[in-house]
Amino acid sequence: MQLQRLGAPLLKRLVGGCIRQSTAPIMPCVVVSGSGGFLTPVRTYMPLPNDQSDFSPYIEIDLPSESRIQSLHKSGLAAQEWVACEKVHGTNFGIYLINQGDHEVVRFAKRSGIMDPNENFFGYHILIDEFTAQIRILNDLLKQKYGLSRVGRLVLNGELFGAKYKHPLVPKSEKWCTLPNGKKFPIAGVQIQREPFPQYSPELHFFAFDIKYSVSGAEEDFVLLGYDEFVEFSSKVPNLLYARALVRGTLDECLAFDVENFMTPLPALLGLGNYPLEGNLAEGVVIRHVRRGDPAVEKHNVSTIIKLRCSSFMELKHPGKQKELKETFIDTVRSGALRRVRGNVTVISDSMLPQVEAAANDLLLNNVSDGRLSNVLSKIGREPLLSGEVSQVDVALMLAKDALKDFLKEVDSLVLNTTLAFRKLLITNVYFESKRLVEQKWKELMQEEAAAQSEAIPPLSPAAPTKGE
């Protein structure tokens, strides 16, 4: 909202009105900021409804301290399957479907509780029709899958995000949010985040990351869907943006994800692929056990969900924390994970990429093959390999360049017109795929080359006898 110069009479009316109506649903309290009589609006949230019996809080996610990671290794859970998904920077938001006997009601919650329908919480009302349809479809899918006649409470947890994308060619949102009481607010005035990155879209969006339900409606009967079930259901709900795996593997493979250089792919998924923002790093990733919530997993009494934040974001959010993060995670937890996975930095999969880009990524990585590696080795020759003149790293780089060269010859022009950020991602992916293949084959290749060299050298002939022998 743009600052305005307000005269004393208007100031008196505004401040007085704000004091008199401090519990009104959407009255913003106006306070003096700076000099010269300029005012800026400050959001005042209305009280939560007294009855919070239907509210089911979402847990705070732990940071990956060394002791937590050690506990997971000792329990045996670290060696099982985990997924790392993007951590979206927004505000916690829950969509509820509550069975009240003769009918079902849809309610909405922030982290602290279910909201009054007239609370202006970051403009979410603009998405209510879509949310209502999605939670009802999800309810029907659950009942069909599990043969249920009713579901007492269903909760779709996620993140409300967006309403900010500062690119010169991308206009601000022109949409307005209308509350049940008729009050209207522009989406362009919503400010979920203050940090300069990550930015996602000028429009408001929702990113789902968990589904839980209770047949009876009681809190103790809630069932949290495992990751695979979550994806199965979410993928069938129209227009639902949900957490997809960037990495799937052991805990160490997820911890080895290069969170420090991870650019958020969400703008491209939301149609802004041609308008990238420089340095638009993701906040980080959330890593969770694929069967989180399963009693067999939770019986170990250790955290089965953790979050990683990139140090650049941490410095913005909590100034002075970058050094602490480096000492408590990057130099300890992550370096330990990298050692255990032999230095293989985990690269983003194509699961978060738009269709054309995902196809291009697959096509390029298919070019990294055993046959191409053999061709590269034949060009190098045996002697440089055995002498160490050409190293394992050199071979990986040559393989990546060769794969990229042929890929560019045959690729569709659509790919050449993708964003610079995606083209950089392609180069990174082909290098790490080449590095992985060379590391996997290196010992065997060197043994074969050494054996071939031995066969190629003729055995020494017995020396001719000298005179007198």
From Swiss-Prot:
One of its GO terms (molecular function) is RNA binding. It comes from the Eukaryota. Residues 1-44 form a transit peptide. It is an enzyme of class 6 (ligase). Its EC number is 6.5.1.3. GO terms for biological process: mRNA processing; RNA modification. One of its GO terms (cellular component) is cytoplasm. InterPro entries: RNA_lig_RNL2, RNA_ligase_dom_REL/Rnl2, Rnl1/2_C_sf. Keywords: ATP-binding, Ligase, Mitochondrion, mRNA processing, Nucleotide-binding, RNA-binding, Transit peptide. Residues 450-469 are annotated as: Disordered. ATP binds at residues 59-61, 86-92, 111, 159, 209, 307-309. It is found in: Mitochondrion. The active site is at 87 (n6-amp-lysine intermediate). It catalyses: ATP + (ribonucleotide)n-3'-hydroxyl + 5'-phospho-(ribonucleotide)m = (ribonucleotide)n+m + AMP + diphosphate. Component of the RNA editing complex (editosome), a 1600 kDa complex composed of at least 20 proteins. Interacts with terminal uridylyltransferase MEAT1. Belongs to the RNA ligase 2 family. Essential for RNA editing. RNA editing in kinetoplastid mitochondria inserts and deletes uridylates at multiple sites in pre-mRNAs as directed by guide RNAs. This is RNA-editing ligase 1, mitochondrial. It comes from Trypanosoma brucei brucei (strain 927/4 GUTat10.1). The lineage of its organism: Eukaryota, Discoba, Euglenozoa, Kinetoplastea, Metakinetoplastina.
